[in-house]
Amino acid sequence: MTNIRKTHPLMKIINDTFIDLPTPSNISSWWNFGSLLGLCLIMQILTGLFLAMHYTPDTSTAFSSVAHICRDVNYGWFIRYLHANGASMFFICLYAHIGRSLYYGSYMFQETWNIGVLLLLTVMATAFVGYVLPWGQMSFWGATVITNLLSAIPYIGTTLVEWIWGGFSVDKATLTRFFAFHFILPFIITTLVAVHLLFLHETGSNNPMGIPSNMDMIPFHPYYTIKDILGALLLILALLTLTLFTPDLLGDPDNYTPANPLSTPAHIKPEWYFLFAYAILRSIPNKLGGVLALLLSILILIFIPMLQTSKQRSMMFRPFSQLLFWTLIADLLTLTWIGGQPVEHPYIIVGQLASILYFLLILVLMPTVSLIENKLLKW
């Protein structure tokens, strides 16, 4: 008799995705981040749902409703900090996942990669509108500054900003619609994740060597289910440590002050996971130029497959490309640091140099070095 998991229409989908899926035998722990992102998404949706039961998206009560969740709701403080720090964990996993794809050439699965870039943009949008909801000082001014960037668009800019605000400033209408966006976007993300997996399972996973994976495949269960459970336990351990010992480590103290349109914080800055893009934005004195650089810093990922000049897919056997890859990581960390600093000397020039290096590495240096490495293959 055939097993039910191989015949039942629903069970068959689960079986082909998580149980009998042929998987390369040599994928490393860098391939764990996909499942960790799935775990983060489920966790964020669940904690977010419980927070939404007590939150009120109204300018007069939003801040107090968050205080009420932390003080009066059973384990409300825990749910709130799990949700806030869960977002940080989400982005750590997301950046590790993208970094792994860049290093091992997984971007050559173009459909999977493009859906992934779309996912990144959607997650960033969700995190941005979510940060506005507690209605603290940084929520209000962050929303004002970032939405204001759209006014740099010629001709329609100002109208567009006022349309997004639902008025002439960030106010009640803005908060209400941002809550609506923050509620709906995770479900759009979930749908995109399904499409992402659909495209991935058309080709199968890449592997560290960058050679065809068909040579040596093993079933996903039990080999990679147990490996993913270990990754999940480590992620949960890290998240709980952060949430229970230093819940405000990654937050901004200004957000414990209720939003006040008449008082501007000394340093307006987004959450840490947007600081690298924020630093690139600030490095260009021209408003429109800054906005374009900000967009390009993320959208440049779409062009990565077109910039592949190497005959080898993975960087595993390409020491010069490896050097440039880790230089890029160091550059992104530098930009993240600069994004959190005030706009003054020497941070301005360091930020500008790091921004130039970021685009130079991706668009010029890495493709050029790959061509040189192709020549070295003949030695």
From Swiss-Prot:
GO biological process, one term: mitochondrial electron transport, ubiquinol to cytochrome c
Pfam (any one): Cytochrom_B_C
Main location: mitochondrion
Binding positions for a ubiquinone per the UniProt entry: 201
Keyword annotations: Electron transport, Heme, Iron, Membrane, Metal-binding, Mitochondrion, Mitochondrion inner membrane, Respiratory chain, Transmembrane, Transmembrane helix, Transport, Ubiquinone
Highest taxon in the source lineage: Eukaryota
Cofactor names: heme b
Additional facts recorded: Heme 1 (or BL or b562) is low-potential and absorbs at about 562 nm, and heme 2 (or BH or b566) is high-potential and absorbs at about 566 nm.
Protein name, as recorded: Cytochrome b
Originating organism: Globicephala melas (Long-finned pilot whale)
Originating gene: MT-CYB
